[in-house]
From Swiss-Prot:
NAD(+) binds at residues 13-14, 35, 82, 318. The active site is at residue 154. It is an enzyme of class 1 (oxidoreductase). Belongs to the glyceraldehyde-3-phosphate dehydrogenase family. It comes from Craterostigma plantagineum (Blue gem). Homotetramer. This is Glyceraldehyde-3-phosphate dehydrogenase, cytosolic. It comes from the Eukaryota. Gene3D superfamilies: Dihydrodipicolinate Reductase, domain 2, NAD(P)-binding Rossmann-like Domain. Its main location: cytoplasm.
Length: 337
């Protein structure tokens, strides 16, 4: 199958990391980037140097001119347009556009990219109305007539594969999720105004901040069997990357914690290899920086109260793992018949 040509709108955390993932893979080709708020030389700087993931070393990166970045010998077109419908994706051959501004998360707004020649749009965030797909869980329900999709959230990508295994094997009656989540760009370095979420405006590096998340409820969209059975919340904590899901569930069938571990291990080595991981090591969050899997079950961190009530813990690099799934979803869509 030919390389799938990708464009990226919005060169923030996820946009830049999707670009990093795409540039080291041989099944996709990055051809264009659009961001109205940064110049091409600043784009190159932000791409090359990354506090969390380190300096980019796979290609020599140069600015050819105001509209072109060179990754080694590979040119990537650069645009600086605010309106999605004005971006000339067709000129660059970009068929799949990653919408990672965080602004155009609704189906109709994201669909504006189609006017510029994009064939499909992948929103790198949850969406109110675009169909959501989580690779390893429900991507097989995608059909080629769908032009705008959402890759859900990083937390839903961690939780859904885990919930699927538990539900398929033992049945989930109901459950609560907490994600202990690293800082993201929407937070404040010092206390500042945040009228919609007062707590969210407090200093990110000095506080544990309770926050809402739709990640658990969204699992019900990708796994309809679990609709209405899961909900959850988040604590934002002062780490810059890697988060951890704590899923506490009531099971339909009795199971020992060892049986649950065995089921997850089996799936992590089988159908969900590369998506779901399994570890019995004494790991901490920084051990997962740069881990491309969606969800890594921590066998030593979980605990069971009884054969029907259990807490399951899974790590995820909320930046790199998620960005890897964006590219996987594009490949799946391109291959779908």
């Amino acid at each position: 199958m030919a390389k799938v040509k990708i464009g990226i709108n919005g060169f923030g955390r996820i946009g830049r990391l999707v670009a990093r993932v795409a540039l080291v893979r041989d099944d996709v080709e990055l051809v264009a980037v659009n961001d109205p708020f940064i110049t091409v030389d600043y784009m190159a700087y932000m791409f090359k140097y990354d506090t969390v993931h380190g300096q980019y070393k796979h290609h020599e990166l140069k600015v050819k001119d105001e509209k072109t970045l060179l990754f080694g010998d590979k040119p990537v077109a650069v645009f600086g347009l605010r309106n999605p419908e004005e971006i000339p994706w067709a000129e660059t051959g970009a068929e799949y556009v990653v919408e990672s501004t965080g602004v155009f998360t609704e189906k109709e707004k994201a669909a504006a990219h189609l006017k510029g020649g994009a064939k499909k749009v992948i929103i790198s965030a949850p969406s109110k109305d675009a169909p959501m797909f989580v690779v390893g869980v429900n991507e097989k329900t995608y059909t080629p007539d769908i032009d705008v999709v959402s890759n859900a959230s990083c937390t839903t990508n961690c939780l859904a594969p885990l919930a699927k295994v538990i539900h398929d094997r033992f049945g989930i009656v109901e459950g609560l999720m907490t994600t202990v989540h690293s800082i993201t760009a929407t937070q404040k370095t010092v206390d500042g105004p945040s009228s919609k979420d007062w707590r969210g405006g407090r200093a990110a590096s000095f506080n544990i901040i309770p926050s809402s998340t739709g990640a658990a409820k969204a699992v019900g969209k990708v796994l309809p069997d679990l609709n209405g059975k899961l909900t959850g919340m988040a604590f934002r904590v002062p780490t810059v990357d890697v988060s951890v899901v704590d899923l506490t569930v009531t099971l339909a069938k009795e199971a020992s914690y060892d049986e649950i571990k065995a089921a997850i291990k089996e799936e992590s080595e089988g159908k969900l290899k590369g998506i779901l991981g399994y570890t019995e090591e004494d790991v901490v969050s920084s051990d997962f920086v740069g881990d491309s899997r969606s969800s890594i079950f921590d066998a030593k961190a979980g605990i069971a109260l009884s054969k029907k009530f259990v807490k399951i813990v899974a790590w995820y690099d909320n930046e790199w793992g998620y960005s890897s799934r964006v590219v996987d979803l594009i490949r799946h869509m391109a291959a779908a018949k």
